[in-house]
Curated annotation (Swiss-Prot):
Gene3D superfamilies: CBS-domain, Clc chloride channel. Belongs to the chloride channel (TC 2.A.49) family. Keywords: CBS domain, Chloride, Chloride channel, Ion channel, Ion transport, Membrane, Repeat, Transmembrane, Transmembrane helix, Transport, Voltage-gated channel. This is Chloride channel protein CLC-f. Pfam families: CBS, Voltage_CLC. It is found in: Membrane. It is a multi-pass membrane protein. GO terms for cellular component: chloride channel complex; chloroplast; Golgi apparatus. The chain crosses the membrane at residues 129-149, 184-204, 221-241, 250-270, 279-299, 314-334, 350-370, 388-408, 433-453, 457-477, 502-522, 523-543, 726-746.
């Protein structure tokens, strides 16, 4: 930590540590680290917009700057190219101080020595007020794009099903099959063919992009074309009636808007997560006209799986602003009506609560069947492609054909907006509404058709199908329960109408299928605006979430360690967790909305950067360090250093709080500057010699520390940027305001990071190999 080696010592140009003031350590949350000198960026600009953000940042940004791995490597290479001899001397001098505890110069010294301009090194993310403004812009952009997407779906639907009334499925069910079979069968197949052809186009664009990756400068226009094509695929899928929903694509549109703004700036991982969360919230808010549910959706699918404590403190404000603005824009363009009309219903008594709990478990069981069907269909289509050598574009056509065949018997499985859901919600109140027995068949058919469409590669979401399946299951359960109880107790009217159970079933199925319990509860509450439904709703949702976790517990135990985020809780693809790429083409086209189906990309969790971003400092730090009290003499400290073979000693005060750090370099500088005698060593306390504070850019700051819940990637970048090899780990939150002291927990060694990284990569590679062997044995090919 202290610098070593010979030469004149300048206290203002050494040992960048900071724990004082508002800049106490790293790890997000309270007291984010100050990394004012940590963002050298040797990257090409991407046009006037990015330059504007950079200019704003240089003038106003005071915090939140990080150094990426690739930038550090670029700077190191450029330094060696500019002055190889100085670089070698610099490294040698750094090793002189007891095993290379730190380098001789601070970052500012290196900038001067190697000719780096401070304006270049100041390049980083915009300030908080600018990001809040960007959150508003994301809301506007997402609202406009989602409205355009919905208009496109309606245009395609009206053209494909011309002459069919708005009630669609109910009308088709009442017609003679001989008059309608060709349309029911051929229209979804046509949609599948178009989607499959566009899959082929995406593969061509992916190959072009990879071939030009080495020559790419500035903005990647192919990356902007990709989400547009995906939105068109989703519009065609839904417009031709295939059994999926529009909310997943709406969320993807919001995420794409956020990615577009993120690519215009130099952003760290946490700010990308914040922008993605704002995009996800705006997508679901504009899709459902439910701003509150959009906020909770972002929290559940983005912030929760990616450690919300590492996100910037203004993330929640960004999410709320984006959600409200996108919902407002969507209202202005599409109207203020809700996604579907909630019928009148009545909750009879609290004695029905056990029935709602049973319904929750039933919905959970349905979601388990559905998720396994999706996996089975996906693997089946992959097997067919490999076995018969079929191109990937054929699979969506087969999915459309399967949906059409099912629709010949049950036309209610076709996507027709939310008219099918409204028809179910009016069971018993409308002559055209299906009966209980037909609803049971329709629920089963919808599960199979949706899993088939999703597994075949058709593009769409699961929210709308989940709501329809849940409504059907709830209506069947409520109607059956009422009939059984009325037969057992004649004249008893203590059971609510099927509409109440249908509403609760919708939320429970949605929560279980997509792992969004809070979003489901808030969404239904926003739609019904009835507080009475919350108690049965929350009970049913809780059990609906519990059933899949129990059912999948055995299956996940073998593979959970092989996935960096765990089952079903991440809204970001592995490639998006890195600081570099956000454009990735995958065959299964999972959207943000689909959180329960496992992402098949297992290569990213073996990536060095991904592992470092997933690991916490507490797993790598060492608790085997030497500490002495501040009253220990310098002679005693020197003997302890020699006997313990340590490079540094942690100095603590009488209350065992971190007071400073003592290195061989500190001792040599004290002895040379003070011409001290043996008597001085025997009487001088280490508190007078150790490093306690540093002056950096005209400000006096304390020791540089980190928190145990910080990511190893952030700590590594900080150590590289500040030229230190050890970093004290202190307890978060226990700040003694008088002196701002911290409780010492451990010591993070730079060399230990690489040792742990090698071991972790080996462990994950072994898990991945076992998983692949198991899959081969299961699939039989």
């Amino acid at each position: 930590m202290s610098s070593g080696g010979a030469g004149e010592y300048n206290e203002d140009r050494h040992l960048l540590r900071s724990t004082d003031g508002d800049e106490v350590g790293i790890g997000g949350g309270e007291g984010d680290l100050d990394v004012e000198s940590q963002s050298p960026a040797i990257r090409s600009g991407a046009g006037g917009v990015r330059d504007l953000f950079k200019h704003i940042d240089r003038r106003f940004s005071l915090s939140g700057r990080r150094l990426s791995f690739k930038r550090m490597e670029n700077i190191r290479v450029d330094r060696e190219r500019h002055n190889p001899s100085s670089s070698s001397a610099f490294s040698a001098a750094g090793e002189e101080d007891g095993g290379g505890i730190s380098n001789l110069h601070s970052v500012d010294d290196r900038n001067d020595e190697y000719g780096f301009d401070e304006e270049v090194l100041g390049d980083s993310a915009p300030p908080e007020w600018a990001l809040l403004l960007i959150g508003c812009l994301i809301g506007v952009a997402a609202g406009i794009c989602v409205a355009g997407f919905n208009k496109g779906v309606h245009v395609i639907h009206e053209w494909a099903w011309a002459g069919t009334p708005n009630e669609g499925a109910a009308w088709l069910r009442l017609q003679r099959l001989a008059d309608t079979w060709h349309r029911i069968l051929l229209i979804p197949v046509t949609g599948g063919v178009i989607v499959g052809m566009m899959h082929g186009l995406l593969e061509i664009l992916d190959q072009i992009r990879q071939s030009n990756s080495s020559q790419r400068q500035g903005l990647d226009f192919l990356a902007g074309i990709y989400p547009v094509i995906k939105a068109i695929q989703a519009a065609v899928t839904l417009g031709t009636g295939c059994s999926l929903g529009p909310e997943g694509p709406s969320v993807d549109i919001g995420k794409s808007c956020a990615n577009g703004f993120a690519l215009m700036m130099e952003n760290n991982r946490e700010r990308r997560i914040a922008l993605t969360a704002a995009g996800a919230a705006s997508g679901i808010a504009s899709g459902f006209n439910a701003a509150v549910a959009g906020c909770f959706f972002a929290i559940e699918t983005v912030l929760r799986p990616l450690r919300a404590e590492n996100s910037p403190p203004f993330t929640t404000a960004m999410i709320i602003l984006a959600s409200v603005i996108s919902s407002t824009v969507s209202n202005a363009l599409l109207g203020t009506q809700s996604a579907f009309t909630v019928p009148s219903y009545d909750l009879k008594s609290a004695a029905e609560l056990p029935l709602y709990l049973i319904l929750g478990m039933l919905c959970g069981a349905v979601s388990v069947v559905f998720s396994r069907l999706v996996t089975w269909f996906t693997k089946s289509f992959d097997f067919i492609k490999d076995k018969f050598g079929l191109p990937a574009i054929v699979c969506p056509a087969l999915g459309g054909l399967g949906a059409g065949i099912i629709a010949l018997k049950y036309p209610g499985i076709l996507y027709w907006g939310f008219t099918n859901v409204e028809e179910i919600l009016h069971t018993g109140k409308s002559a055209s509404a299906p009966g209980i027995w037909l609803l049971a068949q329709l629920a089963a058919a919808k599960v199979v058709a949706t899993a088939l469409c999703k597994g075949s590669g058709l593009v769409g979401g699961l929210y709308a199908p989940s709501l329809m399946i849940g409504a059907a299951v709830g209506a069947v359960f409520g109607g059956s329960a009422a009939e059984i109880i009325n037969r057992a107790i004649p004249g008893n009217a203590a059971v609510a109408q099927p509409q109440a159970y249908a509403l609760v079933g919708m939320a429970a199925t949605l929560a279980s299928m997509c792992s969004v319990p809070l979003t489901s509860v808030l969404l239904l509450f926003e739609l019904t605006k009835d507080y009475r439904i919350l108690l049965p709703l929350m009970g049913a949702v809780g059990l609906a979430i519990w059933v899949p976790s129990v059912a999948n517990q055995g299956k996940e135990s073998d593979s959970s360690e092989g996935r960096s985020t765990g089952r079903g809780y991440s809204s970001l693809s592995p490639s998006e967790r890195k600081t570099e790429g956000v454009w990735r083409h995958t065959d299964n086209a999972d959207s943000l909305e689909l959180t329960v189906i496992e992402n098949p990309d297992h290569n990213s969790f073996l990536d060095e950067e991904t592992i470092l971003e997933d690991l916490k400092v507490m797993r790598v730090m060492s608790k085997n360090y030497v500490k002495v009290s501040s009253g220990t003499t310098l002679r005693e400290a020197r003997n302890i250093l020699k006997e313990s073979h340590q490079n540094c000693i942690m100095v603590v005060d009488d209350d065992d709080f971190l007071a400073g750090i003592l290195t061989h370099g500190d001792i040599r500088r004290y002895l040379s500057n003070n011409a001290s005698t043996i008597l001085d060593e025997n009487t001088c306390p280490v508190s007078s010699v150790c490093t306690k504070k540093i002056s950096y850019r005209g400000q006096e700051r304390g020791l540089l520390t980190c928190y145990p819940d910080a990511t190893v990637g952030v700590a590594k970048e900080l150590m590289e940027a500040r030229g230190v090899k050890q970093l004290p780990v202190v307890k978060r939150g226990e700040v003694i305001h008088k002196g701002k002291r911290r409780k010492l927990l451990g010591l993070l060694h730079y060399d230990s990071i690489w040792t742990f990284l090698r071991d972790e990569m080996s462990r994950r590679r072994s898990i991945n190999d076992r998983r692949k062997d198991k899959e081969v044995g299961t699939n039989g090919h």
